[in-house]
From Swiss-Prot:
EF-1 is composed of 4 subunits: alpha, beta, delta, and gamma. EF-1-beta and EF-1-delta stimulate the exchange of GDP bound to EF-1-alpha to GTP. Residues 75-94 have a biased composition (Low complexity). GO terms for cellular component: cytosol; eukaryotic translation elongation factor 1 complex. Belongs to the EF-1-beta/EF-1-delta family. It comes from Trypanosoma cruzi. This is 25 kDa elongation factor 1-beta. It comes from the Eukaryota. One of its GO terms (molecular function) is translation elongation factor activity. Keywords: Elongation factor, Protein biosynthesis. Residues 75-98 are annotated as: Disordered.
Length: 222
């Protein structure tokens, strides 16, 4: 599979997984296992480790990395013959006379000064670009109405219309309870430093004409 194919497949999967923890919603299934193995292979442990390491860095950190280090392979047959570094011992003696001609206290050229300033600016910009890892949580909660006359779909639309920094609305569904009454089950993702449990409860219960109570079913750190 080419890099182009991987990018295309990744884009399709991003659309399927948007607002979800798994392909089926809140619980993993055999479909998730099959897709995972199709993408990475069932026994590619080194690839798993690489993906895990890569996802531990932010996009800004990855962009700040330099070029890859080139490593030249050395065969066992040629290794013993490479004794050339020992000849470097004569270099200091040869350079002794040349050192006298070098101005150790000479001023840097304009090119050297400009290069140094550019490097300092690049390092400063790289540090500014680094971001701390943002702690997030996925929360699944139930919203129970007063009775069966409450339009839960309309309530879900009202909730999703609420925009708040650090809050992402995911999938929702209507689950039968009893006697024709249903409850709204909603999945969200929050940034822990921006949205607290009290904030969430206050938001849901503010729709007091429709909402009788809310209960958190699952709370998982991402």
């Amino acid at each position: 599979m080419s890099v182009k194919d991987v990018n295309k497949r990744s884009g399709e999967l991003e659309g399927k997984l948007k607002g979800k923890l798994f392909l089926g919603g809140t619980k993993p299934s055999k479909e998730d296992v099959k897709l995972f193995n199709d993408l990475l292979g069932a026994e590619n442990t080194s690839l798993y480790l690489w993906v895990k390491h890569m996802t531990s860095f932010t996009e800004a950190e990855r962009k700040a990395w330099g070029a890859p280090v080139k490593v030249t392979a050395t065969t066992s047959a040629s290794a013993p013959a490479k004794q050339a570094p020992k000849k470097a011992a004569s270099a200091p003696a040869k350079q002794a006379d040349e050192d006298e001609e070098i101005d150790l206290f000479g001023e840097a050229t304009e090119e050297e000064t400009a290069a140094l300033e550019a490097k300092k600016k690049k390092d400063t910009d790289a540090k500014k670009a680094k971001k701390e890892v943002i702690a997030k949580s996925s929360i699944l909660f139930d919203v129970k109405p007063w009775d069966d006359t409450v339009d839960l779909q309309a309530l879900a639309n009202k909730l999703h219309a609420v925009k708040r920094d650090g809050l992402l609305w995911g999938d929702h569904k209507l689950v039968p309870v009893a006697f024709g009454v249903k409850k709204l089950q909603q999945l969200i993702v929050i940034e822990d430093d921006k949205v607290l449990s009290d904030d969430l409860e206050e938001l849901i219960m503010s729709f007091e004409d429709e909402v009788q109570s809310m209960d958190i079913v699952a709370w998982n750190k991402i």
